[in-house]
Amino acid sequence: MHRKEPGARLEATRGAARPHKQGTKPMITRPSVSQLGEGKCPSSQHLQSLRHNKQHALTLTKARCCGECSTCFCTEEKSECQRHEETSPGSCNHQIMSASTISAFCATPRFKQLFKGTVEQMSQM
């Protein structure tokens, strides 16, 4: 697992003007797109189809997250998000959450309920 590398390089290029976002944002109250049901990773095929249907997935869950999660997902979204931030600061309205925040958030019953519904919708596509 190489969790730190892609983010660390990008963080360094942002300079000190923008303090670390990790941990400074409040918990989001919407489900995130990091596909984390019960802490199990979805199959790579599922992730693949999610990338293909990214717009649809975003519409379904009504939230985006580019925090990197220890159990799954999301280096692509995170770096994509940070590239946008570098070219036009303030353009990214994503929540950047640390792995522990995401894990804690995804463990909440409310999220599991919402996530379950999303998975059912996704599987009917």
UniProtKB/Swiss-Prot annotation:
Does this UniProt record's set of keywords contain Cytoplasm? yes
Entry-linked Pfam families: DUF5544
Subcellular localization(s) per the UniProt record: Cytoplasm; Nucleus; Cell projection, Cilium, Flagellum
Q: Does the keyword Cytoplasm apply?
A: yes
Which stretches are tagged as biased composition: Basic and acidic residues?
1-12
Protein keywords: Cell projection, Cilium, Cytoplasm, Flagellum, Nucleus
**What InterPro entries does this protein's entry cite?**
LINC02914-like
* Tissue expression from the record: Expressed in testes and ejaculated spermatozoa (at protein level).
Q: Name one GO cellular component term.
A: motile cilium
Q: Annotated region Disordered: where?
A: 1-45
Q: What does this protein do?
A: May play a role in the flagellum biology.
Q: What is this protein's record name?
A: Testis-specific protein LINC02914
Organism of origin = Homo sapiens
